Amino acid sequence: MNSLQVKICGIRSINSAFAATEGAASYIGFNFVPSSKRLIEADAAKTIVRAIKENYPDINTPKTVGVFANQPLLYVNSVAEYCELDMVQLSGEEPLAFAEKIISPTLKAIKVDTSAPWESELRRLDQLAKLAKRLNVEVILDKYDPHLQGGTGQTHDWQLAAKLAEHHSFLLSGGLHPGNIQSAISSVRPLGVDVASGIETDGKDDANKIGRFITDAQAAHVQIYN
């Protein structure tokens, strides 16, 4: 049985980054979307990335991910290189082909439109997931919101997500937190999960919640597959 991939996003402090590392998170994300309340400056992100490498030289540390949305290619690549990031996540309306121009391995947020007819939306998502696989792009399944970029913090149709998971691998995102993560994993059975608002207290990333979320997510995964 493969372990569940867990992405802790919106990291803004070294303590939270260390909590994610010690909890064996698969990824930690830094948000560079200007409109996001989790925006981090490149210098601060670089400091955290280096602190992880320096303080945990003997373990497999999480892959560091920069989150961008509808930002110029030159900017995306420059920040990824400057911050020494492992990966880039595209969370806007960028076409999947945009990922071919990114200097780092790429994640792409595919958005679920809960107002669309169920069958047609499933077909659309299936086509996007197939294209992502051909381009070696990992998929994050999030909820569509025309007013929010870089993560919505809203749950979407887990039944549709479960149907998509029968044929495609992706990280489930959108409104996850310690209180619903077991239900999300048992309902959808995704490759992994992605969380930001669900590990915050008063709008700030919370090291204790990060540890609890990872533990609960992995426990739910083990319970399903054992």
Which residues does each PLM region occupy?
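Glycine-rich phosphate-binding active-site loops on the catalytic face of alpha/beta enzymes
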Residues: 25-37, 89-98, 144-145, 188-211
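Conserved anion-binding
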Residues: 32-36, 49-172
